[in-house]
């Protein structure tokens, strides 16, 4: 029988900001994989509210007591980052059918670029199916309550940045 090697997964994203949905996926990921690398995307077409350094720092604070989680950043193609990392799996979360089409296309393109890299999809916990960083930003900017929607370690920083007059 072939020896089973520890599998490291990369969980990529903009994380602007990190949500409880993201956190839930990473915590489920470390039950499935030996290690999860949270890879914060630097070059993105999204209009981010937090700099790359701030997003990396927030993720590091969230996972500082979780030795199976490493936080890193990358620019360029995700496949190139994964090829240079100890990982051989890309971990992605799916909230709804609408996520699947986009994620499926990306997984196929990544596989075309490097056939040795697999993409694994985890369904988002039902409590967080509606949640996205964009929704968090929209609710906060318009005075809505986001307590419990972002990890407590970054709540104050997110409020300070997003809520007018804070």
Swiss-Prot record:
Pfam families: CTP_transf_like (PF01467). ATP binds at residues 14-15, 22, 93-95, 103, 128-134. Its cofactor is Mg(2+). InterPro entries: Cyt_trans-like, PPAT, Rossmann-like_a/b/a_fold. Belongs to the bacterial CoaD family. Reversibly transfers an adenylyl group from ATP to 4'-phosphopantetheine, yielding dephospho-CoA (dPCoA) and pyrophosphate. This is Phosphopantetheine adenylyltransferase. It comes from Maridesulfovibrio salexigens (strain ATCC 14822 / DSM 2638 / NCIMB 8403 / VKM B-1763) (Desulfovibrio salexigens).
